[in-house]
Amino acid sequence: MKTVIKNGTVYQNGRLIHADVLIEDQKIKVIGTNLTGDKEFDATGKLVAPGLVDVHVHYREPGQTYKEDIRTGSEAAARGGFTTVGAMPNVTPVPNTPELMEKMVKKNQEKGIVHIFQYGPITNDETTDIIPDYAALKKAGAFALSNDGHGVQTAQTMYLAMQKAKANNLIIATHAQDDSLFNHGIVNEGKKAEELNLPPVTELAETTQIARDLLLAQKTGVHYHICHVSTKTSVELVRMAKARGINVTCEVAPHHILLTDDDIPKDNGYYKMNPPLRNKEDQAALLVGLLDGTIDLIATDHAPHAKKEKQGGMKGAAFGITGSETAFSTLYTKFVKKDKVFTLEQLLSWLSDKPAEAFGLKDAGVLEPGKNADIAIFDIEHEATIEEKDYKSKGVNTPFTGQKVYGETVMTMVNGKVVYQRGTK
């Protein structure tokens, strides 16, 4: 059967064009005008984009399915326009053997409604210094390695991990955090931490580990990816490293460019995340880093929790906020439509082709004939309100609920199949 998406504004090869998209046999066949098919979707006034790519999500299965599971997490991704995601390995048990990795990959395929690529751990349970068999994990389906949620605390362990990752052509994606400097902190060091009388988080907890790892990456030649950079100094370190030819990429999370610690209204668990919200100077540096190419891509760090784990003050709350369902609309509304900091083409690139390119996901993030028909359609002309009742995720832990936005997802397709359509259950 031939399906045509008609009359849309199509993002292709870095440009926006007025075109139709013809889909057949799960693939994009033609992008052109005056196309016809057996089934047609009218996308007049809508944005037709490649399915977005999010290389940083937490789906909590197995082990904590009361927070999220593969099905609900992937449904949330689809509702946000994401068709390809990278799932972090901080589940129970951690997929640190080929048997566990194979089981995880199979579960992702059976339960997920989007393409789910699975990370393996850098170290066995993400906190020890024991390095698993990377070759076996890769053979079993691991596409990259991460201890996200934990920094690798010893330089020797990271050095060995990088050597082994390089030998197996695997990316090391790190949560840069020196625990001795993090020191059970909650809010970014500064006025807000003092005002709320909460333990501060120094930027050094992030930046010292990035500096260490960049030297190790230079020595080993590994592809070193930094998750959720959040400080001005982090951006400066990456900029210098790229100038020296170090094989480094990095991501920024939407909340770190949309919000600062000044936006925390009170001691509210919904604003507790790791890294924490930083100051305005850091926020400005992150935006400059995106615009000049120092920061390669945007990734949500979708981290769902049960309501009871985020209610009340920050001290007792879990770290993390959701992001899959709010990322595109909040970023588009603030930075493209209102403040005009980015172009729409730039935003789409950071959410589609750039992450796919960074992680070598060859079929993802582009609209081209012959590629998988992974497509997201957004309504960028009409305002909508982000409402808790609409979330597909089990987690509702986001400060963006109630915001009025443009860019709501109308439809998401994976391999030509509609996996989300606005207004349907």
Swiss-Prot record:
Its cofactor is Zn(2+). It is an enzyme of class 3 (hydrolase). Gene3D superfamilies: Metal-dependent hydrolases. Zn(2+) 1 binds at H56, H58, D148, D301. Its EC number is 3.5.2.3. Binds 2 Zn(2+) ions per subunit. It catalyses: (S)-dihydroorotate + H2O = N-carbamoyl-L-aspartate + H(+). Substrate binds at H58, Y59, R60, N90, N274, H305, F319, G320. Zn(2+) 2 binds at D148, H175, H228. One of its GO terms (biological process) is purine nucleobase catabolic process. This is Dihydroorotase. It comes from Lactobacillus acidophilus (strain ATCC 700396 / NCK56 / N2 / NCFM).
